[in-house]
A protein has these predicted regions:
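Terminal helix/beta-alpha structural elements that buttress the NAD(P)+-binding lobe
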Residues: 1-176
């Protein structure tokens, strides 16, 4: 992925989606990210063009994109996300999901973790290894951020799970 790419990130305001946005922006790609309107300002701060998910998503993405979408990262796993992805990108090797792993082969797309029945290839393992030092470098420079949510004592772990299930923004931190 690079400056000639337009990446669509489904669930761009989630933790993994935010990471995908930041990496793609660092590599020079144009990024369009789906999220609820309440999260659009945050996506703009990360360098993405936000679009609301829901009815009409395909048209909104096409309207927002400066050129054709060339790559898709699916962190949502919804039927809408898959359908829009398949409509936008002909090269199925450039569509990846972390959520619909068991279904990926039936769509002809890539699965990364997320229940994929296929282990990571050597190339994919190399990508992960290559990403770690780059991530540390970006974190150290302040060019990569991880959104933190509430900090709770370990004794409130059950409450932390409730917050995760309620989709509270940011990573919840449990402390001893």
């Amino acid at each position: 992925m690079g400056p000639d790419d337009v990446l669509l990130v489904h669930a761009g305001s989630g933790a993994v989606g935010q990471a995908a946005v930041q990496f793609a922006v660092a590599w020079g790609a144009t990024v369009i990210a789906t999220a609820s309107p309440s999260r659009h300002a945050q996506l703009r701060e990360l360098g993405a063009i936000p679009v609301a998910y829901g009815d009409g998503l395909l048209e909104r993405v096409r309207d927002a994109a400066p050129s054709d979408v060339t790559v898709v990262f699916d962190g949502a796993g919804t039927d809408e996300a898959i359908e829009v992805s398949l409509a936008l990108v002909a090269d199925r090797d450039r569509i990846g999901t972390i959520v619909r792993g068991p279904d990926a082969a039936s769509f002809g797309i890539r699965a990364f973790s997320g229940g994929s029945p296929v282990p990571l290839t050597d190339e994919e393992q190399a990508w992960r290894a290559e990403a770690l030092p780059k991530t540390i470098e970006l974190l150290a420079s302040g060019d990569f951020v991880i959104e933190l949510g509430p900090e709770l004592p370990l004794a409130e772990a059950a409450r932390a799970h409730e917050l995760v299930e309620a989709h509270v923004a940011g990573k919840i931190v449990l402390v001893p």
